Amino acid sequence: MSKNNAVEFRHVSFTYPDTEKPVLNDINFKIRSGSWTALIGHNGSGKSTISKLTNGLLLPDADANSKIIVSGITLNSKTVWNVREKVGIVFQNPDNQFVGATVGDDVAFGLENRGVPRNEMIRIVNRVLSDVGMLDYINAEPANLSGGQKQRVAIAGILAVEPDIIILDESTSMLDPNGRNQILKIIRQLMIDKNLTIISITHDIDEASLADDVIVLNDGKILAQSGPIDIFSKPELLQEIGLDIPFVEKVILKLKETGIKVPQSIKTQDELEQYLCQLNSKK
């Protein structure tokens, strides 16, 4: 595996017990280190199965040609714990991840399991809570937090154990638009500051448009893998499998039809509005 790849799947299939049809069927892909990759597809397409395979929560169907490589480690029954140290998952419902009586206790849980000395543990907990803007809540009870605050704490708990890869498994789907945008901004900044690899499992097409790369799944196979501009410039491809294109991409396509070219660097609605205002002011 190239040093530039954080995750690589080679000829990976997976079939759940008591079912005949594989949920993943001979898939191959690579995810670049330090990048943000979004996995999109309808329910049952295999997105969450990929996240569990990447973390070693599941092992692929037995096949001599099948291989999963994570942070340079080939995943198997002997290396699964090494792989899990490299990958952290933030799930859809943060309540299912909380184990501590306070925010600080919860973030410290993974460090306690690794035998980190108390003074070092306190330093790490304070640092990661500061990273996600939750240090003021260190003594708060998780049950009293908002959904967005709970997800920030869940992210801090993952950051504390310093993984190479963070998987967001539908982790913004239960948040309101403001909470979702705040979480995505935090993740993007952490990715840059700490050179993390982010894998986003999402139904939210607008969230996927913010990624560096997009993998489109359909019925256990990879339909396409490319940058978001390329993927979302083919609306018919997504519509065939019941997906839409992001609102911003819809507007950009309409502008293109009228002869207005929008820079490829523009991904968000705010950036598009700012560009159009600048364009209008030049007239």
Swiss-Prot record:
Give an example GO molecular function: ATP binding
Start and end of every ABC transporter domain?
A: 7-244
* Membrane topology qualifier: Peripheral membrane protein
Q: Where in this chain does the entry annotate a coiled-coil region?
A: none
Query: Which EC class is the enzyme in?
Result: translocase
Annotated GO CC locations: ATP-binding cassette (ABC) transporter complex
Q: What is its main location?
A: membrane
Q: What is its EC number?
A: 7.-.-.-
Keywords assigned: ATP-binding, Cell membrane, Membrane, Nucleotide-binding, Translocase, Transport
**Which residues does ATP bind?**
41-48
Q: Which PROSITE patterns match?
A: ABC_TRANSPORTER_1 (PS00211), ABC_TRANSPORTER_2 (PS50893), CBIO (PS51246)
- Give the source's domain of life in one word: Bacteria
Which InterPro entries does the record associate with it?
A: AAA+_ATPase (IPR003593), ABC_transporter-like_ATP-bd (IPR003439), ABC_transporter-like_CS (IPR017871), ABC_transpr_CbiO/EcfA_su (IPR015856), ECF_ABC_transporter_ATP-bd (IPR050095), EcfA_1 (IPR030947), P-loop_NTPase (IPR027417)
Location(s), subcellular: Cell membrane
The record's listing under Pfam families reads: ABC_tran
Its function, per the record, reads: ATP-binding (A) component of a common energy-coupling factor (ECF) ABC-transporter complex. Unlike classic ABC transporters this ECF transporter provides the energy necessary to transport a number of different substrates.
What family is this?
Belongs to the ABC transporter superfamily. Energy-coupling factor EcfA family.
Task: Note the subunit structure.
Answer: Forms a stable energy-coupling factor (ECF) transporter complex composed of 2 membrane-embedded substrate-binding proteins (S component), 2 ATP-binding proteins (A component) and 2 transmembrane proteins (T component).
NCBIfam families in the record: ECF_ATPase_1 (TIGR04520), PRK13648.1 (NF010167)
The protein's name: Energy-coupling factor transporter ATP-binding protein EcfA1
> Which gene holds the coding sequence for this protein?
ecfA1
